[in-house]
Every structure is written in C-alpha cells, then in structure tokens.
Amino acid sequence: MSGVNNTSANDLSTTESNSNSAVGAPSVKTEHGDSKDSLNLDATEAPIDLPQKPLSAYTTVAILCLMIAFGGFIFGWDTGTISGFVNLSDFIRRFGQKKTTRGLTTYRK
C-alpha cells in the first residue's frame, strides 16, 4: 500500500487542473448567441390552459377499452374451457382416435 496516501480532509488542498481538461475549457458560443443565457423566457407570459372536457367526452373511449379488455378475458376463458373439455374421459371415449401414435390425418398433412 505504498501508493496510497493516508491524508485527512484538512490536509487536502486545491490544485490547478490540467489545461487540456474539459472542465477548464472556455465556453463555446456561436455568433448567433447560442448559450444558456439566451434561453431566458419571459416570466410575464401566462401558461396555456388546456380546455377541460366533461366525463361524457370520454365515455366512448372508456366503453371501447372495456370491450377490448373483456375480449381478452373471453379469449382466455374460452381457451381454458376448450382445453379442459377436450381432456374429459367421455369426450375422448366418443371422439378420440384409437391409434394416437399416427398423429394428424393424411387430409391435414
């Protein structure tokens, strides 16, 4: 640990940084005056208020969102119901294939 200096906070002093560092570089201003000072906005300018819409204006959007959400719910419900129905022993006994190792029929291939 010979490279580490154990100095207290009181012993630290400021030193001059490298002249090539980005911190010491002068600010760059163009001839058009692009600087932070040119971004001053008038404090007297009033903010623009958005028009307030009644809740009835959002009724159609709310109904459409509910219908879309309900459609996703029904899709999941339907898929779960059909999957459970196909696995019932009575359904397999009546409509199942006797040779299940064959896979799909030749009509579907």
UniProtKB/Swiss-Prot annotation:
Residues 78-109 are extracellular. Coiled coil: none annotated. It holds the Pfam family Sugar_tr. It is a single-pass membrane protein. GO terms for molecular function: transmembrane transporter activity. Its main location: membrane. The chain crosses the membrane at residues 57-77. It comes from the Eukaryota. Residues 1-40 are annotated as: Disordered. Glycans are attached at N87. Residues 29-39 have a biased composition (Basic and acidic residues). Belongs to the major facilitator superfamily. Sugar transporter (TC 2.A.1.1) family. This is Putative transporter-like protein YIL171W. It comes from Saccharomyces cerevisiae (strain ATCC 204508 / S288c). The lineage of its organism: Eukaryota, Fungi, Dikarya, Ascomycota, Saccharomycotina.
